[in-house]
């Protein structure tokens, strides 16, 4: 990589509610037994098909906002269908098991619905054919606080999961560290930034194909503590929604006719990279089904094309340092997507990010994007030197030019885009280039 060309002339469903209190059947084999606790508001003839043992009937209507819903899937070895959902009121959110496939359309994201005659099993709502679900009337619409929605998306730390009671149902999003396939089951070791735990998936339910680095979203897994070692085990209602890790692809230098059809994942803000000529640009990340590309966009009027979720076709672009460069003669056109998931949470798709330990093992210069914590800051001659770290190590970053005006302090989390990985003697470090972008990530309120 040419330093001369790169350098400027001045030189990316779950908290405590992610789990639930222990189910009445901690083994996971009786969650669909047709029993319910008696109560003054219950009718003895109410059918309890598919409802968990000990579930309590609630006849009073409750208005909720639908946050998410999975696709229907087979359980009981393919004999029955169900899907999982997450809903919220003004004060809390709930995990929901829905056994009536006629209700799938009602459980559409952001839709307000009123439910009654549902069951509550240890904090999880269960809805079968006897429940009543209808669209909420205008005067029934509720306002769900952002912190409730945010909490529903958070994942409880594995270290905290291990402290819960045996039988607790676990929901969460985790990365795959290892995978082992047996005759009757698939065993994963999943991890977060601090810990790991084993997950056992019964192959009678679904044969899933996810590997190291992929992301798994677990629904209704049972925490077991046999022999004193916690594991997560699938039950009758368990479901896994996976996401394959997108590998970075590098475009060869020079002109490319195209078209290349991709989905926009995310984009930076527009920024000035040449203050003398007042030239602006932005960076974007786009992806196919299996790989992602970094894009440098030098045309201001193309910002709306790169809205996350948009399917676009790129033509007449250039390969530049492995990235795609879009200039005034390039063509970016919107394409009507045939994939419903393209426009759903596309900016959250899992892409491969190099950790600092990986950067130290590189053998040649390259461009780097990433988010890191700042632990050190010092000011030099026309530059600022930062010390950054992640959970694998630390590295030096040298910032010069316009990026020295970014208000970044020790303790901040920063996003670096298009920084050059280079070396001085036997030390690898990052430095800003002509096209680098840097911003401080503010915590959500």
Curated annotation (Swiss-Prot):
Changing residue 79 to A: Strongly reduces affinity for DNA. Changing residue 222 to E: Abolished DNA-binding. Induction: By beta interferon. By IL6 in splenocytes (at protein level). The record marks 84, 283 as: Mediates interaction with TP53BP1. Gene3D superfamilies: Nucleic acid-binding proteins. One of its GO terms (biological process) is activation of innate immune response. Residues 42-51 have a biased composition (Basic residues). Changing residue 229 to A: Strongly reduces affinity for DNA. The keyword Coiled coil does not apply. One of its GO terms (cellular component) is nucleus. Changing residue 166 to A: Strongly reduces affinity for DNA. It is found in: Cytoplasm; Nucleus. GO terms for molecular function: double-stranded DNA binding; molecular adaptor activity. Changing residue 431 to A: Impaired homotetramerization. Residues 1-27 have a biased composition (Polar residues). Phosphorylated. Residues 1-57 are annotated as: Disordered. DNA-binding protein involved in innate immune response and has anti-inflammatory activity. Inhibits caspase activation in response to cytosolic DNA by preventing activation of the AIM2 inflammasome, probably by sequestering cytoplasmic DNA and preventing its being bound by AIM2. Also inhibits activation of the AIM2 inflammasome via a direct interaction with AIM2, which prevents the interaction between AIM2 and PYCARD and formation of the AIM2 inflammasome. Binds double-stranded DNA (dsDNA) in the cytosol. Belongs to the HIN-200 family. This is Interferon-activable protein 202.
């Amino acid at each position: 990589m040419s330093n001369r060309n790169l350098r400027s002339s001045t030189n990316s469903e779950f908290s405590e509610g992610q789990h639930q209190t222990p189910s009445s059947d901690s083994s996971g084999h009786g969650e669909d037994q047709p029993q319910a606790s008696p109560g003054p508001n219950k009718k003895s003839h109410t059918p309890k098909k598919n409802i968990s043992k000990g579930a309590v009937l609630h006849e009073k209507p409750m208005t909720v906002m639908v946050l998410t819903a999975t696709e229907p899937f087979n359980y009981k070895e393919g004999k029955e269908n169900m899907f999982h959902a997450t809903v919220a009121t003004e004060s809390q959110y709930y995990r929901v098991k829905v056994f009536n496939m006629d209700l799938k359309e009602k459980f559409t994201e952001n839709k307000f619905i009123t439910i009654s005659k549902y069951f509550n099993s240890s904090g999880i709502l269960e809805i079968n054919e006897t429940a009543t679900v209808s669209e909420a009337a205008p005067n029934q619409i509720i306002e769900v606080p952002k912190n409730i929605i945010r909490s529903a998306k958070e994942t409880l730390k594995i270290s905290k999961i291990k402290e819960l009671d045996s039988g607790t149902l676990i929901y969460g999003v985790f990365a795959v560290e290892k995978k082992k396939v047996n005759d009757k089951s698939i065993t994963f070791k999943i991890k977060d930034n601090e810990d790991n735990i084993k997950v056992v998936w019964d192959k009678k339910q679904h044969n899933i194909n996810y590997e190291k680095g992929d992301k798994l979203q677990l629904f209704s897994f049972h925490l077991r503590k046999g022999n004193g070692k916690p594991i997560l085990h699938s039950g009758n209602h368990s479901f896994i929604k996976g996401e394959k890790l997108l590998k970075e692809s590098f475009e060869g230098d020079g002109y490319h006719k195209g078209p290349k059809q991709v989905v926009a994942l995310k984009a930076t803000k527009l920024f000035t990279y040449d203050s003398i000529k007042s030239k602006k640009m932005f960076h974007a990340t786009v992806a196919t089904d299996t790989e992602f590309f970094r894009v440098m966009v030098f045309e201001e009027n193309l910002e709306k094309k790169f809205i996350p979720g948009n399917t676009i076709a790129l033509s007449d672009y250039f390969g530049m340092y492995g990235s795609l460069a879009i200039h005034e003669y390039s063509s970016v056109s919107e394409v009507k997507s045939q994939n419903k998931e393209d426009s759903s949470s596309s900016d959250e798709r899992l892409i491969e990010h190099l950790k600092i330990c990986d950067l130290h093992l590189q053998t040649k210069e390259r461009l780097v994007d990433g988010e890191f914590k700042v632990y050190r800051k010092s000011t030099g001659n026309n530059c600022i030197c930062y010390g950054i770290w992640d959970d694998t190590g630390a590295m030096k970053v040298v910032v010069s030019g316009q990026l020295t005006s970014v208000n970044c302090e020790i303790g901040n989390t920063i996003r670096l885009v298009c920084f050059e990985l280079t070396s001085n003697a036997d030390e690898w470090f990052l430095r800003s280039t002509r096209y680098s972008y840097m911003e401080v990530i503010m915590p959500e309120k």
